[in-house]
């Protein structure tokens, strides 16, 4: 194999790591998102991997990715969600909180 090809293959192998969080940062973000979900959302939504939502109209968080692209919720979370399910109060999160909540939602997809 030529040196240029080896260099290109090595660069491609490292590329995904440039755009992802280190595992400990991801875990911390997921934990923060879980805390936000339990504090702000668990009265109506099932926020864990199991169980029904206390409010029937509120979808379980583990199923949200089947309804919406979870990555697209960042703007709605930052601007304030006003229309979710019937009776849903308005929530507004700062960008870091929105990112943490999205990380938690994505962790439920696995």
Predicted regions mapped to residue ranges:
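Positively charged n-region of N-terminal signal peptides that target proteins for export
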Residues: 1-4
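Electrostatic cytochrome c docking/interface patches
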Residues: 20-36
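Gly/Gly-Pro-rich "capping" loops immediately C-terminal to redox-active cysteine motifs
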Residues: 32-34, 48-78
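The canonical Cys-X-X-Cys-His
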Residues: 33, 38-47, 101
């Amino acid at each position: 194999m030529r040196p240029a090809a080896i260099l290109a293959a090595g660069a491609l192998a490292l590329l995904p790591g440039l755009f992802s969080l280190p595992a400990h940062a991801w875990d911390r973000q997921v934990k923060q998102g879980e805390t936000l979900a339990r504090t702000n959302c668990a009265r109506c939504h099932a926020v864990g991997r199991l169980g029904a939502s206390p409010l029937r109209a509120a979808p379980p968080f583990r199923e949200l990715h089947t309804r919406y692209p979870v990555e697209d919720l960042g703007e709605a979370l930052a601007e304030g969600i006003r229309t979710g399910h019937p009776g849903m109060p308005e929530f507004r999160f700062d960008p870091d909180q929105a990112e943490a909540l999205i990380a938690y939602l994505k962790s439920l997809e696995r």
